[in-house]
Amino acid sequence: MICAFLRVVQHAEKLHGSLGRQLLPHFVFTKACFKTQPLRWGLREQKITVQPRTVLRFTQKTFWTQGPDPRKAKEDSTKQVSIRRNQREETGVSMSQKVREAGRDVSYLIVVLFGVGLTGGLLYAIFKELFFSSSPNIIYGKALGKCRTHPEVIGVFGEPLKGYGEMSRRGRRQHVRFSEYVNNGLKRIRVKFYIEGSEPGKQGTVHAEVEENPGSGQFEFRYIFVEVTPTRSIIVEDNRSEQS
């Protein structure tokens, strides 16, 4: 009986020990959790209280970084000064370019006006030579026409009759020689040219003079004569007695 009682006691101790070993970790873990629970809440509260500080710090830092930087302000002022300087230089350059372009345009205008004036003068001279009665060429043509219709001139020189101006050293025939002068307020023009016909060795010198008519403004012949030899001349037209 005693042996059986001892076995029961041993068995009960073993059972109690195994249950204690099984319940001890759970008890320890629960107790640890219970003890650390305020610590967790404290950490959460600390995290909650710290978080606004972090936000404020971040906001202050952001505000501080967005504030004016002396270096950046200096660089901006330098850039503004350089931009203004460049604008002034561009304005000066543009003004000088405008002045040069204006001078160039004025020079071109002067050249164009000079060319137009020169062309107009040449055209006027050509028109005067071809159509004005005071032109030496017009006087020469009219005098040669009168010589070609004069019977005595044709009889001496033959036909066809041709006229020409002064001979040069190279044998070229120059323009008709002429001279101008004024008598009693009236302009007079003298011309001199040469004629030849079909008769060999025959050459005559034609002298003609015109005078301005005060009434019509046209030039009329005072005389036309052909010098055949130094001692012989053919009078084609003579109005000196009427005009004088």
From Swiss-Prot:
Keyword annotations from UniProtKB, A to Z: Membrane, Mitochondrion, Protein transport, Transit peptide, Translocation, Transmembrane, Transmembrane helix, Transport
| Residues that span the membrane, as ranges | 107-127
Say which domain of life the source belongs to: Eukaryota
Residue ranges under compositional bias (Basic and acidic residues)? 69-78
| InterPro entries from the UniProt entry | Tim21, Tim21_IMS_sf
- One GO biological process term: mitochondrial cytochrome c oxidase assembly
Q: How does it assemble?
A: Component of the TIM23 complex. Component of the MITRAC (mitochondrial translation regulation assembly intermediate of cytochrome c oxidase complex) complex, the core components of this complex being COA3/MITRAC12 and COX14. Interacts with COA3 and MT-CO1/COX1.
Q: What does this protein do?
A: Participates in the translocation of transit peptide-containing proteins across the mitochondrial inner membrane. Also required for assembly of mitochondrial respiratory chain complex I and complex IV as component of the MITRAC (mitochondrial translation regulation assembly intermediate of cytochrome c oxidase complex) complex. Probably shuttles between the presequence translocase and respiratory-chain assembly intermediates in a process that promotes incorporation of early nuclear-encoded subunits into these complexes.
What protein is this chain from? Mitochondrial import inner membrane translocase subunit Tim21
> Highest lineage ranks of the organism?
Eukaryota, Metazoa, Chordata, Craniata, Vertebrata
